[in-house]
A protein has these predicted regions:
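Sec-dependent N-terminal signal peptides
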Residues: 2-16
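Hydrophobic targeting/anchoring helices
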Residues: 17-122, 371, 378, 413
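Extracellular ligand-binding/catalytic regions of CAZymes and related secreted enzymes
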Residues: 17-23, 29-60, 237, 335-416
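Helical hinge/lid and interdomain linker segments adjacent to catalytic or ligand-binding clefts
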Residues: 19-20, 25-29, 64-69, 118-224, ...
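Alpha-helical scaffolding within the catalytic cores
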Residues: 92-97, 141-143, 351-355
């Protein structure tokens, strides 16, 4: 639960501290760097007030010269607040479907990414770099050594936890593919695994354990469904012989345990290495043509009670309700295969596609967002990274940055 400060408590300090409002509605000149300003304030040990559903999820920050200078340098719009204006804002928060959440810590952020250069971008590292938010890069060695527990928040992107090398078999003669294959095989042997798929499944289990003990997991694209598949099919060899030299275990492939997965169930696998798809989870499927154009592809963010459901409300803060869709190896999720406890944050109201989901695992949480890059509708292998200065008000990238601030929220003491 999130600690919600009442109006009476708030008035104890608003009279003595100058504050600025960073609006997050259509008036904002740079939404993405605004998150960086909020994060920077937390790094200076200054609390940030996140106004859920007020002008697109605006921030109130204590005014000092460094924050003001940062806003000016980053072209982030801010408004100086008077006591009267603050009073009006807090009164509105109390009366409307709005809420105030205190952000009071700087989340330690890790991005799971291989050491070798991959021929595609990562939307989260692009967002973090553009917003000037610090993060560390971790990979399999750090996971095996227990280093994940140094971090509050972990991101997974275009990764494959099934040991099928991203199902990029068509690129098997490319140098980057050969390097990936060689690196993964060496690392698996280093930890006494005879196949990459057994090793990668173990990595998925360790990440799940990290989340269940209180970690925050945010994943996009193929890292979402391949992660869940690795957990559910942990004891089944479904990797084609071209990957590990052994045939698919067709006898035991039905011995799936969907209880081990965190988000999906009752789906079927695609084991053919020439099909660029893991399972029937993905919707629409990557290997089947779609007639939808980029102009007509969008998903709708769900509406929640800010006072009763502050967590999902935080995750959907935006200046728009309908967000442009974007494709990926895993573009979205077939609603048919969602577990009952999974909360839908965004979906296509006219099809079976769910785009954005959230759930709990033990003491931690996970959030999955389908698609590869919110501002590159069809991101292909070898395409250059997206230039975010051309998309500084991107609604899709805002969803990523909402997840960055989510772990900073102050916890509410449990009632006795």
């Amino acid at each position: 639960m999130i600690k919600i400060l009442t109006i009476s408590i708030l008035f104890n300090f608003i009279f003595t501290i100058n504050k600025i409002l960073i609006p997050m509605d259509d008036s904002q000149t740079n939404h993405l760097k605004a998150y960086g300003v909020a994060f920077s304030s937390l790094e200076k040990q200054n609390k940030v007030e996140w106004l859920l559903n007020y002008r697109g999820g605006s921030f109130i920050i204590n005014l000092d010269n460094s924050i003001k200078r940062e806003c000016l340098l980053k072209n982030v719009l801010f408004e100086t607040l008077s006591i009267e204006k603050i009073s009006v804002i807090y009164s509105m928060l109390e009366q409307e479907n709005m809420e105030l959440v205190i952000l009071d810590k700087t989340p330690k952020i890790a991005v799971y990414s291989p050491p070798n250069q991959q021929p595609w971008d990562d939307a989260v590292t692009l967002a973090l770099t553009y917003a000037e938010i610090k993060y560390d890069v971790v990979f399999d060695d750090e996971v095996m050594n227990g280093d994940l527990y140094k971090y509050d928040w972990l991101h997974l992107h275009h990764e494959d936890f099934t040991g099928q090398y991203g199902k990029f078999y068509r690129y098997r003669n490319q140098n980057w593919y050969k390097e990936m294959e060689n690196t993964f095989t060496k690392t698996a042997k280093k930890y006494n695994f005879d196949t990459v798929h057994k090793f990668k499944k173990t990595i998925a289990v360790k990440i799940r354990d990290y989340v269940s003990k209180g970690g925050f997991l945010f994943a996009m694209c193929s890292a979402t469904d391949s992660f869940d598949i690795a957990l559910s099919f942990y004891n089944v060899d479904f990797a084609h012989s071209i990957y590990d030299g052994t045939p698919i275990d067709k006898i035991n492939i039905s011995n799936v345990d969907f209880e081990n997965g965190i988000a999906f169930e009752n789906y079927e696998l695609y084991t053919d290495p020439t099909i660029y798809e893991y399972s029937t989870i993905d919707y629409p499927s990557s290997h089947q043509p779609t007639t939808r154009s980029a102009e007509s592809d969008y998903f709708t963010l769900s509406n929640f009670s800010a006072k009763w459901d502050p967590v999902p409300t935080m995750l959907v803060q935006n200046h728009v309700t309908n967000v442009n869709g974007f494709m990926g190896q895993t573009t979205g999720y077939n609603k048919e295969f969602l577990k009952s406890h999974v909360l839908i944050l965004g979906e296509d109201l006219y099809s079976s596609q769910v785009k954005y989901i959230h759930g709990n695992i033990g003491k931690g949480t996970f959030t999955f967002l389908g698609g590869h890059d919110p501002e590159d509708y069809r991101h292909f292998v070898g395409d250059p990274p997206t230039e975010l200065d051309l998309h500084r008000n991107s609604p899709g990238y805002r969803l990523i940055l909402n997840n960055i601030l989510f772990p900073a929220a102050k916890k509410k003491p449990k009632k006795t």
